[in-house]
Amino acid sequence: MSTRPYTSSVRTAAAAAKRDRVIEAAARSLREDASIASFSLDAVAKAAGVTRLTVYHQFGSRRGLLEAVFDEIARQGGLTAIADAMAMSDPHAALDRLVEIFCAFWNRDPAVGRLHEAMATDPEFAQALIGRNERRRTTVNVLIGRIAGKTASPRARRDAVDLIFALTSFAMFAMLRADRSVDEVCALVKSACHGALGPLLSDASRSGSRPHRPGASRAG
């Protein structure tokens, strides 16, 4: 009887375990090392107990490793809940839920703050994080489209998206968190997001459309 399928599955499992170990070591480096500038394939390989070539084969580059670590931080931080929020029938409730998800995420992992601080000095970190943040902008844009209806002006929609994108950022969370609890920050950001919708809803009403109002989908 051939042992090839068994051997293949063992190798696959071993490779997956090694990959997980590298990601864990990389995430630990981002959380604990004195300087994020020391983050490299060599340093992570040493911490994970593997060769640099192994890390290179698994991730291809420092950027590839960063993306894998970001994916894991996002998974552990609850960003997978965004899909459920976007499936909510009431876009206002979905926006509130989005704020809750990001407040919890920004608060959970010290690596998140350190990564944003590193954007000023490490172009590769900056490029990776800008791409991640643009996903949040895209999500906000979808919700604004649902809330505004079809006739709100492009300017009003853009202003609402930009404001809410800024309000849900790590920089905003960190500034507000200095002397507030996470729940207080979350409530304040929600209120500010509701305020950011005001001009958008007024613009849509003047245009003759019927923008989605809070709780409209639950009206009987």
What are these regions (language model features)?
Residues M1-A17, A204-G220:
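N-terminal intrinsically disordered/low-complexity leader segments
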Residues R11, K18-A25, A156:
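N-terminal positioning helix adjacent to the helix-turn-helix/winged-helix DNA-binding module
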Residues R21, S29-G64, A68:
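Helix-turn-helix
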Residues L41, F70-G78:
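Short, basic, alpha-helical segments at the C-terminal edge of helix-turn-helix-like DNA-binding modules
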Residues G64-I73, G113, R132:
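Alpha-helical DNA-contacting segments of helix-turn-helix folds
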Residues A68, A81-R108:
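Hydrophobic alpha-helical connector segments
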Residues E100-L115, E124-K150, R158-D162, A187-G198:
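Amphipathic alpha-helical packing segments from all-alpha helical-bundle domains
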Residues V142, D162-S181, G195-D203:
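Amphipathic C-terminal alpha-helical segment
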